[in-house]
Amino acid sequence: MSNFAQGQWFVLRRSQTIPSLGLLAVLVTTCLVTDLLARNRSLERWTMAEITEFAIANGTLFSNTGNFIDFEDRVLLDEIPHADYSRGGIYFFGTSNMKWAFTKWDLPTDLQRFIGNYGIGASDHTTQLRLIRYLIAQRGFLTAGEKDLVILGVSFHLAHIDDPSTDYFGSLLRRHGLYTTTSDGNIVPVPMSALDRWLRIEKARSGGFFWNIGRVAKSWLVAHAGLAHGPLPGLFGTPDRLRGFMGGEHWQQNMDAQVQQLRETISLVRSHHAEVKVMLLPQGTWMDQLPYRARYESLIRALCQSTLTPLIDLSRSMPDNDFVDSNHMTVEGQEKFRGLIMEEILGHLHEAGIY
């Protein structure tokens, strides 16, 4: 190749490389800026405050997602990995009516660190037991012993039949490739490098950041365009659909099996010298027309009596108009509920000498 041809080839390659490097620099910078914004706690609090106000205005459900796509992503990818369980605290477990029962993002930071709301949507007592086992085995949960208080928020929904094809928690664990379950149902992290894990978490955080900006925009549009339908308290779904959700003709046997899982959960927590209480969560009066509530609550009372487990009965503590749908509370309802349990929270933290 002549010197002239070599020179032309070099100029061509340089003319291609510089724009490519420039584009790469723009992409990297965009990703870094997005991640920095997504990790900004002040911006996160502003987003949650805006979504809260629009939830009040539109009469919709508020979910504390932080800068993630949903509540559970925030808990699994951000809150739990940064939790310090060595000092003790108070931790709530349950299904969706527990996770959306109260918020803590607007509490003082030094109080937030001792409170965990680990509700998982569409879960049952088996899922709660597996989650607690994971936290103990992988995260050092309950290492503070008597300084820990676990409150199991319960309702008959935790005794439903989980359809494997629509297993929300299983799909949640697999969503980012960070967790999996063993053949016996234990939750374990997928082996990978620290860098790979960090990149996956930050990708989830950045995606959630854009998702929540979209939530703010959509909520603003609904509020200002008069499209809000307001709360829709009342029974959701037909009796047949609810019966299928609870296990069809075998709903009683399934309920018994799930309550047994709750018994095992209580035993597990106590084996680590932690305190445990059961809380019957608020229910609308429309639940009285179903056979599930009365039987489930009867089983829970018997279980608490036989295991000497304190029972906090808040099942009828909220009026129907504090529900946004059949089973979840409005923002005003969440604030009232937090007021009801704050004495329990502060009482334990003061007694344990950690707040």
Kindly give the residue locations of the regions a language model identified.
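A generic structural signal for well-ordered alpha-helical segments
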Residues: 108, 269, 303-304
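Histidine-centered active-site loop/cap adjacent to the catalytic His
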Residues: 3, 325-355
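Extracytoplasmic/secreted proteins, especially bacterial periplasmic and envelope-associated proteins
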Residues: 127-130, 190-197, 208, 257, ...
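Second-shell loop/turn segments in exported
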Residues: 92, 117-122, 248-255, 288-290, ...
